[in-house]
Amino acid sequence: MLRYPYFCRIHKNFLSCWLESGIYNLGVWPKKIHATAERYNEYEAQEETDQTGIQELHRSQDRDSGVMTKLHIPVMVDEVVRCLAPQKGQVFLDMTFGSGGHTRAILQKEPDITLYALDRDPTAYAIAEQLSELYPKQIRAILGQFSQAEALLMKAGVQPGTLDGVLLDLGCSSMQLDTPERGFSLRKDGPLDMRMDGDRYPDMPTAADVVNALDQQALASILRAYGEEKHAKKIASAIIQARGLYPITRTQQLASIVAGAFPPSALYARKDLLQRPTHIATKTFQAFRIFVNNELNELYTGLKTAQKFLRPGGHLVALSFHSLEDRIIKRFLLGISMTERFNLSARQKVIQKSQLDSDQENKEGVSTGKAPLMWKLIHKKVLTPEDEDVQDNPRGRSAKLRAAIKL
């Protein structure tokens, strides 16, 4: 059923949080949930009854972590390990454990370490717990979001300024995309869910709640801000028209609605970095996923938590998969405010020159008009996957790696 109180509250919270952080100005958002929610409520109740048997089967498959682990190939493993440079006795935090590919690689490089494995996905947490049985002295599994990480780390006995390395591997994992009932992929039909936390928070809105409740202006704002979709108004209008006839509850149902807003020739007109055709609804799915999971706010909070818990000289490695994530990471590492409107590359040059001219002044926090620099970049330019890596793992084609040392 549609979660009215929570949905209204989280909708307002998202707005206030975005305006406060200044990362993106989404403009004026609606304050009321549409009356279509009532019709959706009744429809969803019947849908849940019809789908119970199928979902139980999927859940049992989801618990088979051995199978799920094989579905995810970690991206840029060698580069991640080199940037983290694990040494004997050090302590690390993998903030996006997933199926543990990067964690295993780090342990293979240096087994005599302690590694805290954090993930918001209960399936990933189950895999981390299973792996901790094989590495009882090394791995500590933690279930939670980036925004909960500080409290969870303190509870686990980790003090600020003590970690030697932190890894963030953002976006969806293959095991999430390839599990239809999670509702992340437009290629496999399933309930329109998209919650990375799974069923941990029953009142948390799903993607179906979003597309069936928000008005056209709000939907267009989400598509524009989180999907960078230039046809946001057209797609939002198509969603409004379709849900007036029937509630939108399935992934391929939403994909078909988006496709129907364009001529057939446009369905796969867009190309990815490998020049392969991509579905016209890809950006729409990205936008709703980011909104449902509050991903960009979570990322910014995660970066601040990493900075707080890393020791001076500790390494931060962040893998992103779209420009919104990379932009936040880049600005954070360069000390550029999220509200900065100057061209980023030009602004970067100003900061670098300022660092050379008055390095000591910045360190002491003397009035310079800028925050003291907190990071030294390991690489001057962002790292991307090698051609061979992309051939082996096409899903990692858009990966960007940024690494820095805390000053």
Swiss-Prot record:
Protein encoded by which gene: METTL15
Protein name: 12S rRNA N(4)-cytidine methyltransferase METTL15
Disordered: annotated segments: 44-63, 386-407
Keyword Methyltransferase among UniProt keywords: yes
The enzyme's E.C. designation: 2.1.1.-
Function: N4-methylcytidine (m4C) methyltransferase responsible for the methylation of position C839 in mitochondrial 12S rRNA. Involved in the stabilization of 12S rRNA folding, therefore facilitating the assembly of the mitochondrial small ribosomal subunits.
Signal peptide span: none
Modified residues (Phosphoserine): S358
Amino acids binding S-adenosyl-L-methionine: G100, G101, H102, D119, F146, D169, Q176
Coiled-coil residues: none
Recorded family membership: Belongs to the methyltransferase superfamily. RsmH family.
Principal cellular location given in the protein's record: mitochondrion
GO CC terms of this entry: mitochondrial matrix
Highest taxon of source: Eukaryota
First-level EC class: transferase
Chain intervals with Basic residues compositional bias: 397-407
Keywords associated with the record: Methyltransferase, Mitochondrion, Phosphoprotein, S-adenosyl-L-methionine, Transferase, Transit peptide
Location of this chain's protein in the cell: Mitochondrion matrix
GO biological process: rRNA base methylation
Gene3D superfamilies linked: Putative methyltransferase TM0872, insert domain, Vaccinia Virus protein VP39
Catalytic activity: cytidine(839) in 12S rRNA + S-adenosyl-L-methionine = N(4)-methylcytidine(839) in 12S rRNA + S-adenosyl-L-homocysteine + H(+)
GO MF annotation: an example: rRNA (cytosine-N4-)-methyltransferase activity
